[in-house]
């Protein structure tokens, strides 16, 4: 055990599109289900099956908190159309939930979905177009399994002319700032 309570990333892994047939589900979900860590991300990577990923997290008892919105963010975009039950509006509120979970000895992680800042958010139709084009290329090129995520992300950067990479950089910075504030509040509780 490393004792890391807050972990920041761009987007968590999850169930790939078609996971009902090929069972391609990221180990991120298994870890969140059993490891006492709070992950701050811009949601789930947009290339994944968001509803299925959220269902798996619910099944594993992982609280999903959205920061400042009642809609689950979709990585490059601020919204996915998926409504969530638990909205948090301050780092202190997140820290209080983490502390309550810890004090009550509930094992497993917490996912804090923090939308990309509006000025860096991409157009949802453009993102969907890039993802669908990348998925078609992957199928044509025979890419699957552990190679699919890096292939898709690289291809999406090419298709978007680098806009997705810039969005990714900005959302990680945004998540790091929120994660630091949550950690500070948690240390003071």
Q: Residue spans of the language-model regions?
A:
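Anionic-ligand binding region
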Residues: 76-103
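Glycine-rich, Lys/Arg-enriched anion-binding loops that position phosphate/diphosphate groups
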Residues: 49-80
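Solvent-exposed alpha-helices and their adjacent loops that cap or buttress functional pockets
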Residues: 1, 6-8, 24, 29-34, ...
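Short, well-ordered, mixed-charge alpha-helical segments that flank or form enzyme active sites
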Residues: 8-9, 14-19, 46-49, 73-76
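Active-site glycine-rich loop that binds ribose-phosphate moieties when present
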Residues: 20-58, 91-96
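General beta-strand structural signal in soluble alpha/beta enzymes
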Residues: 6-11, 17, 39-41, 64-68, ...
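Glycine-rich beta-alpha junction loops
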Residues: 13, 68-73, 113-120
């Amino acid at each position: 055990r490393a004792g890391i309570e807050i972990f920041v990333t761009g987007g968590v892994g999850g169930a790939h599109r078609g996971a009902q047939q090929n069972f391609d589900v990221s180990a991120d979900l298994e870890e969140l289900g059993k490891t006492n860590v709070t992950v701050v991300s811009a949601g789930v990577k947009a290339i994944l099956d968001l509803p299925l990923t959220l269902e798996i997290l619910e099944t594993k008892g992982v609280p999903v908190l959205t920061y400042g919105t009642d809609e689950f963010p979709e990585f490059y975009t601020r919204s996915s159309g998926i409504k969530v039950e638990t909205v948090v509006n301050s780092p202190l509120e997140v820290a209080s939930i983490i502390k309550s979970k810890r004090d009550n000895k509930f094992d497993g992680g917490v996912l804090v979905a923090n939308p990309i800042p509006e000025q860096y958010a991409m157009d949802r139709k453009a993102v969907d177009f890039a993802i669908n084009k990348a998925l078609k290329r992957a199928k044509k090129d025979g890419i699957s399994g552990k190679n699919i995520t890096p292939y898709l992300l690289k291809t999406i950067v090419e298709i978007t002319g680098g806009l997705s990479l810039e969005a990714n950089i900005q959302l990680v910075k945004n998540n790091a700032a929120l994660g630091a504030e949550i950690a500070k509040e948690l240390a003071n509780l």
